[in-house]
Structure formats: structure tokens, C-alpha cells
């Protein structure tokens, strides 16, 4: 592992993490890793006998401030299987001007599989944050994962009434864009209270499963998972044009949405 960590401690972070995996036998392995502070990875581990490699992503700086630019460039060679998690919730601190930005580029080659399941991101009031995902899938490659955002430090009674959050997703199959989305929220009291925006809720989640084609039976299974928890109107399910599944959450509990998304990833996916 190489680490380039010579930085000015008073300057914004400009850091990248580059990883590559292959699968020469039963187990997926990390074969290349280049890191820059404050980004790190824990040693890979294998919690079961499937050969899936689990990698925990770390941010040792404690959070992002205005002007920080963090990038993840990850390649999975053919038949690799990797689950990415994070050690703790991400934190985006308030900024008087510059944006914080994080970009994730995933290249998933033939027959490889990715599960992307980090902890939530907490966006402080008055923060400015841009999150970008670009996922490129080759033939028979699979992706499932989520993004969970908490707006404001609600444990302190803070609301997201000032600030700006943007999220961009692009998922490609070869040279075809199979799913893309742009989200944007500009903090205000009106946004917080509007039934067409946050409706007083503080947590948003998006789950994307492009690991298989979903028929109505699988959609029904997904609905049963949601309804069995006693949650109803703040979840939504959508089939994409390529028969992938998108689930959405609007509520107040990061633990609730993580539990539901975890069940979806375990029960209805191969």
C-alpha cells in the first residue's frame, strides 16, 4: 500500500483512493491500493465462504469542510465480488462559500458484482455538498447499493434551513446509460415543511439494485419487506426501463432505512 500524505493541514483536502480487485480462485482479493490522506482502507476480510471480499473505507479527517475534494476510483476485474462499507457516518461541515465534493467511479468488469453500503452522510446546516456516482458495468456485471443522507444534526435540534446538497448518479451498461438521476435541495423553512419536499422529515435514502431483472413476483417480495416493518407511505418502489429496482425512503430514522435496505439486498438479490 502506498500513501501520499504530505499536505498543508490548514488547506482543504484534495485526496484520492484507487483500488483494484481480481478473483484468480475462490476468493476475491485486493491487488492494488493507492491512498492519499485522509482516505484509508482497512485490511480486507471474508465473513463467509462465498469468496466475497469486504472492504471498509475510512476517512481519518473526521469530516469534510468547504473546498475538500475526495475521489474514489475502483476497478473490479472479471468475476470479482466486493462489498464496500464505511466505519462511521460521513460529516459535511458548514461552509461560508466553497463546496465539499466527493466522486465515486466504479468500473465493474465481466461478471463482477458490487455491493455499496456505506453509513449515512450527515449534512450540517449551512453546508454545501456535491456527491457524484459514476458506475460502468460490463456484460453480466452487477451493482446494488445505496445512498443515505441526514439533513441537519437532528440530535441537537438542527434543521437544514440553509445550505445546498446535490447528488448525481450515472450507471452505464457498456455505452448505454441505464439509469441516471440528479437531485438537489436548497435549504429553507419552506423546503423543510413542504409536503412535496421534506415534509418535516430529515432523512432521505435511495437504494439501487441492478443485479438482476425484476418481475412482479420480486417486486411483491420487496413490498412485503417494507410493509412487514409497519412502514408505509414514506417508501416507494420503481422498476427501471431495464427492470432494475429503485427504492426510496423519506423519514426520520437512519437505522430504519438501513435495516430495510439491508433486507432488500439480502432477500431479493441473488
UniProtKB/Swiss-Prot annotation:
Purpose: Required for maturation of urease via the functional incorporation of the urease nickel metallocenter.
Keywords (A to Z) from UniProt: Chaperone, Cytoplasm, Nickel insertion
Protein name: Urease accessory protein UreD
Chief place where the protein resides: cytoplasm
One annotated GO molecular function: nickel cation binding
Pfam families: UreD (PF01774)
Organism per entry: Synechocystis sp. (strain ATCC 27184 / PCC 6803 / Kazusa)
Keyword Chloroplast: no
GO cellular component, one term: cytoplasm
Subcellular location: Cytoplasm
Domain of life of the organism encoding this protein: Bacteria
Family the entry assigns: Belongs to the UreD family.
Subunit structure as annotated in this protein's UniProt entry: UreD, UreF and UreG form a complex that acts as a GTP-hydrolysis-dependent molecular chaperone, activating the urease apoprotein by helping to assemble the nickel containing metallocenter of UreC. The UreE protein probably delivers the nickel.
HAMAP family from the UniProt entry: UreD
Amino acid at each position: 500500500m502506498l500513501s501520499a500524505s504530505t499536505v498543508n493541514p490548514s488547506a482543504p483536502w484534495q485526496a484520492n483512493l484507487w483500488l483494484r480487485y481480481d478473483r484468480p480462485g475462490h476468493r476475491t482479493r485486493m491487488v492494488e491500493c493507492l491512498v492519499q490522506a485522509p482516505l484509508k482502507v482497512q485490511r480486507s476480510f471474508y465473513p463467509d465462504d462465498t469468496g466475497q471480499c469486504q472492504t471498509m473505507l475510512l476517512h481519518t479527517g473526521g469530516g469534510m469542510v468547504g473546498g475538500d475534494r475526495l475521489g474514489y476510483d475502483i476497478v473490479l476485474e472479471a468475476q470479482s465480488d466486493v462489498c464496500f462499507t464505511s466505519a462511521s457516518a460521513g460529516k459535511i461541515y458548514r461552509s461560508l462559500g466553497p463546496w465539499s465534493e466527493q466522486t465515486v467511479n466504479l468500473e465493474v468488469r465481466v461478471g463482477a458484482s458490487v455491493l455499496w453500503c456505506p453509513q449515512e452522510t450527515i449534512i450540517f446546516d449551512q453546508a454545501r455538498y456535491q456527491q457524484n456516482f459514476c458506475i460502468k458495468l460490463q456484460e453480466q456485471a452487477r451493482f446494488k447499493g445505496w445512498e443515505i443522507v441526514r439533513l441537519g444534526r437532528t440530535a441537537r435540534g438542527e434543521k437544514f434551513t440553509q445550505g445546498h446538497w446535490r447528488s448525481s448518479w450515472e450507471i452505464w451498461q457498456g455505452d448505454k446509460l441505464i439509469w441516471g438521476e440528479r437531485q438537489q435541495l436548497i435549504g429553507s423553512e419552506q423546503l423543510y415543511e413542504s409536503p412535496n419536499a421534506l415534509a418535516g422529515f430529515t432523512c432521505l435514502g435511495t437504494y439501487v439494485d441492478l443485479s438482476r431483472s425484476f418481475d412482479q413476483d420480486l417486486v411483491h417480495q420487496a413490498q412485503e419487506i417494507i410493509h412487514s416493518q409497519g412502514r408505509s407511505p414514506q417508501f416507494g418502489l420503481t422498476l427501471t426501463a431495464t427492470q432494475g429496482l429503485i427504492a426510496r425512503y423519506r423519514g426520520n430514522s437512519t437505522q430504519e432505512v438501513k435495516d430495510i435496505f439491508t433486507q432488500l439486498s439480502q432477500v431479493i438479490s441473488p
